[in-house]
Amino acid sequence: MNKLITIVVPIFNEEEIIGKTSSRLIETADGWEEDYEIIFVNDGSIDQSKNKILQFIKQNKKKNFNTKIKLISYAKNVGKGYAIKKGIFISKSKWILTCDLDMSVLPGQYLIWKKRKLIKDTNCAYIASRTHKNSKIRSKFIRRRLGGILKLILFNFFSLKVSDTQCGFKVFHSSYIKKIFNKIRCYDYAFDVEAILLMNKSNIKIIELPVSWVHRSGSKVHLIKDSVKFFLDLLILKRRLSR
């Protein structure tokens, strides 16, 4: 494996923020000591997201970043989980970091974890937890309230003790993560939950780490509507796993 870390970034209709957040991502990663690659995965966007990323890659060729930035794109929107799976499967790195393009968690969070030696065991998954006692969160009360309700649902449905499954900032090791995502069948709202359940079954330890998280304006998440869809996905997942 040539790269030490791959950053997988799923994209769906993000044309308005691609330029700003992509530049922030690569500027931060270029300051890391280890080698890296960034894989953008365009999950069937119907806006100009694909062209914006291609333009970004072209602009950065002058800075010798072209070998470190890749774009995977396909026409049909399948879901965030599928996009992350596609990125993971072409990764050539020891470690894989997934993060959202809106930069609710800044990529420098990974470096903070590394400096504190919180990431070391290859048989663990490291998940940013907005409920961790040392996390610094800037969000509305209703989001925090819904997070607490979700925690209760996950425990009652799956006996899952992970307090925050949905933060997109996660670090996995290549020794297990491709096998895990090869088994995933839920590609939409509940894919994180299914991945964590599969990791538990495979004796992969889930470690929740503190994070600085800010709700960004322009986010594509519709709180109430997406919460309902997420709950329905959990019902489908529970029924499938109960067979």
Locations of the language-model features?
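Donor nucleotide-sugar binding loop of glycosyltransferases
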Residues: E14-I17, S45, K80
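Hydrophobic helical membrane-anchoring modules
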Residues: M1-I5, E16, K20, L152, ...
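A conserved acidic beta->alpha catalytic loop
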Residues: N42-I53, M103
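Acidic donor-diphosphate engagement hotspot in glycosyltransferases and nucleotidyltransferases
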Residues: T21, S49, I84, G108-L111, ...
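Acceptor/aglycone-binding surface of glycosyltransferases and processive sugar-polymer synthases
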Residues: Y74-I90, W95-T98, P107-Y189, H215-L232, ...
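Hydrophobic/aromatic residues located in beta-strands of well-ordered beta-sheets
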Residues: I38, L71, A125-Y126, I206
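Short beta-strand/loop segment that forms part of the nucleotide-sugar
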Residues: E34-S45, I72-S73
